[in-house]
């Protein structure tokens, strides 16, 4: 599966006290153990079984062997159609496969997905399959922000956030850290500028005041997870 790699113990951006900014669309695609499947690794801790955040690209007709998610798997479909024996998932699909679940993923037309592995709270056994293109939106923390809730469990919150063009977002802090993947549009803050494909991880206790670009922005945003318990990796 996505996390099998024949390397020595790998540590990539595992210090959650540090800010990480990656412009993923400029990163090279690296081969995975499965033919036709490549990835961009954003953070990673572990050997063959790893706690990892990646962007994964399936070529048309590629697939993985059946595998079990020992620590859970979270997927957001960015492009194309991702599939397994349970269904077909178009762009905007949000999936959570809790610890102990098994599937055999593939893609007939090809796809690009954002994947987080082995990052479930030990008590979280909820399966999620949400089509965000048809999802409902509610008000965010200030006027000009709309939020679609994807998942929430014991202080960890995952949402899609839609922000109006040229919006100045009020200064706010991230007590449990924050992670953003820019899906559309762009924004800037005190630490940098971010466009489609930018991934930023802000440490617990950090703060910022984003200014949204002239075309607005659509973000995948997770908060609280950098201080939350997760399933332990096997020894």
Enumerate the language-model features and the residues they cover.
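A short, N-terminal "cap"/entry segment at the start of jelly-roll beta-barrel domains
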Residues: 3-48, 110-155, 235
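Surface-exposed interaction/gating patches
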Residues: 132, 138-184, 189
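Short acidic-glycine-tyrosine-enriched beta hairpin
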Residues: 83-100, 189-208
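Short histidine-centered beta-strand/loop micro-motifs
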Residues: 54-55, 65-69, 86-87, 105-106, ...
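Glycine- and acidic-residue-biased ligand/ion/polar-headgroup-sensing regions
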Residues: 59-62, 69-84, 174-190, 196
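Ligand-binding loop in jelly-roll beta-barrel domains
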Residues: 37, 88, 99-123, 204-230
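Fold-core signature of tandem repeat domains
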Residues: 64, 76, 82, 95, ...
